[in-house]
Amino acid sequence: MRVIPLASESLGVRSLATFVEAGGLRILIDPGVALGPKRYGLPPAEVELKTLQQMRKKLQGYARKADIVTISHYHYDHHTPFFEGLYESSSEDYAREIYAGKILFIKHPTENINFSQRKRAWAFLKNAEAIAKKIEYADGRSFDLGGVTIEFSPAVPHGSEGSKLGFVVMVLIDDGSKRVIHASDIQLLNRRSVKWIIEKNPDLLITGGPPTYLGPRATGSWETGVKNLNEIILETNAEVILDHHIVRDKRYPEFFDELEKRPKTFAGYLKVEDRPLEAYRRELHKIEKGEGAEVPFRL
């Protein structure tokens, strides 16, 4: 099995897009990239927009290779919509390239879903149904694909129990020699997802941390995230790739320091420098204006 992290906050955009080659199958997980439209009251800096285009180009390249596409939920950093979006670098052509002729395993569009995501799922399916090879609603189901098993969790909260952001599905890929779980946007904040991960006992866990950058709206999420991920590490001894929401917080290295086994970011797994652009948006705007500011990465 070969696991290739594609795009994430440590690579400069909002995403957790991943490509997996297993048993002759080529699987693209959560094919979306986006930028936060506002952070510190500021729009994306120029370097963020440039990086978004680079990540879109990379995502489309891997989409052309994929046989299977999985979608954990309908936020635009996890799937590419069929409209032209500046901060999603999206278009109908990009979407068609990703989904046409592919087998799609997707979060159920009408069950365990909030109003916003239900609307997005409807818009997605209105376009995708005509071009996909096959579409399966994946929640809680398992698929045997000739030596490779792809298993999906039941719908679990997007974050803490009772979250207004809706639900997501996690995916396990097992080729008989390695078990990989991609646990998108669980934020390590609900017991259902933690129990499912421990029960499935992965060799590698790819997940997003808590949204500690939200400040008072995320009170207690740091402690809960550390506790839950440490439990997963101790129970499974999985290698962990941790990225996404937590890397929007400049303090994310301190979060990593509190874990029983230090995870890698997407950038770290790829052996390149972390470039958490959104976390340093204030500094990036100052640099672009010629004002004095420093960031802990190369521009």
UniProtKB/Swiss-Prot annotation:
UniProt GO molecular function: hydrolase activity
* Source taxon at top rank: Archaea
* Pfam families from the UniProt entry: Lactamase_B_2 (PF12706)
Question: Gene3D superfamilies per the record?
Answer: Ribonuclease Z/Hydroxyacylglutathione hydrolase-like (3.60.15.10)
InterPro entries attached here?
A: Metallo-B-lactamas, RibonucZ/Hydroxyglut_hydro, UPF0173_UPF0282_UlaG_hydrolase, UPF0282_hydrls
Q: Which family is this sequence assigned to? A: Belongs to the UPF0282 family.
Q: PANTHER family annotated for this entry?
A: UPF0173 METAL-DEPENDENT HYDROLASE MJ1163-RELATED, UPF0282 PROTEIN MJ1629
**What protein name applies here?**
UPF0282 protein TK1681
